[in-house]
């Protein structure tokens, strides 16, 4: 019997082919991350503002025109331009001469350190008025103490009045003591007057005896 050769397997992807297929995806992702590095929005804004010769500063509309002339897509990156302006003003690289926020006019700050120095000074001046406000309640607290001292003084004045009333209360007692001996002196006199009255019944007895004698004589 003749041996038959095994049929060839259908086209199966080799393992190396799968790895090769995955690599292009990673390369595509790397291409997205590796965009051509150009100047940032803040750098473009600073260049455009420094190039302007206007004394009052470069307006937002003029800034957009300058960026568009340099090949920057202003319509798509409108929000980035506004954020870049705000960050540059907060850092002190740009000074806003007109308007508020991202709208208005901007110019380069010749002394960028001045903005950072002025901010802490304002905080220090705002903190100074708090010290006198703290002293006022202390002064107000001292005033009631003086009022309490004034209230204490009438108590001292009341003490002599109380002493005078005590002396006045004691004086009637002395007067009562002085009046008592007189009553005691009068009482013996009354006792003496009563004693002779007790002696009178004794004098009546002889009269009764005399009456008996006269009756005996008549008999």
Swiss-Prot record:
Residues 1-19, 27-39 have a biased composition (Low complexity). One of its GO terms (molecular function) is structural constituent of chromatin. The modification N-acetylserine is found at residue 2. Residues 1-40, 94-219 are annotated as: Disordered. Keywords: Acetylation, Chromosome, DNA-binding, Nucleus. It is found in: Nucleus; Chromosome. InterPro entries: H1/H5 (IPR005819), Histone_H1/H5_H15 (IPR005818), WH-like_DNA-bd_sf (IPR036388), WH_DNA-bd_sf (IPR036390). One of its GO terms (cellular component) is nucleus. Signal peptide: none annotated. This is Histone H1.01.
């Amino acid at each position: 019997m003749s041996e038959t050769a095994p049929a060839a397997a259908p086209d199966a992807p080799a393992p190396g082919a799968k790895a090769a297929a995955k690599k292009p995806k990673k390369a595509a992702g790397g291409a997205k991350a590796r965009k051509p590095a150009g100047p940032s929005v803040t750098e473009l804004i600073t260049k455009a503002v420094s190039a302007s010769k206007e004394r009052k500063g470069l307006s937002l509309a003029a800034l957009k025109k300058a960026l568009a002339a340099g090949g920057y897509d202003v319509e798509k990156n409108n929000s980035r331009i506004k954020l870049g302006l705000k960050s540059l003003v907060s850092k002190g690289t740009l000074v806003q001469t007109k308007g508020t926020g991202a709208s208005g006019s901007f110019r380069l700050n010749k002394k960028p350190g001045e903005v950072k120095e002025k901010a802490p000074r304002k905080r220090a001046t705002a903190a100074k008025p708090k010290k006198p406000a703290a002293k006022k309640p202390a002064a107000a607290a001292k005033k009631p103490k003086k009022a309490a001292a004034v209230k204490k003084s009438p108590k001292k004045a009341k003490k002599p009045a109380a002493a005078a009333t005590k002396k006045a209360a004691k004086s009637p007692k002395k007067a009562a003591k002085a009046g008592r001996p007189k009553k005691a002196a009068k009482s013996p006199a009354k006792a003496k007057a009563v004693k002779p009255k007790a002696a009178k019944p004794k004098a009546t007895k002889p009269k009764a005896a005399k009456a008996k004698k006269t009756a005996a004589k008549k008999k």
